[in-house]
């Protein structure tokens, strides 16, 4: 599924059913040695997907460490993103010569828990939710797009980005009660000076998909 919302040049892999014999890379085991089983499965599954995607780029199946704020440490010359939710793990990677950053996120297609929306959204976003006639869980889609935005932002800035510091707008290209797809635009509301020598960040554009009970969002920033 995730590959349908990523551009050419980005490789991806996803895992819906967790193989019982799947094990952590030996060099990653210490990172989850004290983790509960669910956390272990999410960690191992997402990094398994990462190595499958790296292979499609022609990269070796290396260990993927954890950096500041838990961000994955990719091989030199590679950018990427990991995501997981109940029943789903995925990774997307690309060569840095083609894309400056990638951010993906996955969420269950269900409404946000009570009280969460106000803490993750801006007034214009809540107004859009009120006035948009759709059977889709657009509140969770908004949250998912904010998460992908942060994942694309962090590697280029090494700075926190709050939910209130990005304004997300959506285009719905197709939608029914339980599936849909379209695009989104993330306008960044804080200075976006970067650490890669590139132009400052002003906004991100991405795509979204709702299918098989999941919401997926993806940004590939060139």
From Swiss-Prot:
It holds the Pfam family ACPS. One of its GO terms (biological process) is enterobactin biosynthetic process. InterPro entries: 4-PPantetheinyl_Trfase_dom, 4-PPantetheinyl_Trfase_dom_sf, 4PPT_N, Enbac_synth_compD-like, P-Pant_transferase. The lineage of its organism: Bacteria, Bacillati, Actinomycetota, Actinomycetes, Mycobacteriales. Its cofactor is Mg(2+). This is 4'-phosphopantetheinyl transferase Npt. Its EC number is 2.7.8.7. One of its GO terms (cellular component) is plasma membrane. GO terms for molecular function: holo-[acyl-carrier-protein] synthase activity; magnesium ion binding. Monomer. Mg(2+) binds at residues 105, 107, 147. Keywords: Magnesium, Metal-binding, Transferase. It comes from Nocardia iowensis.
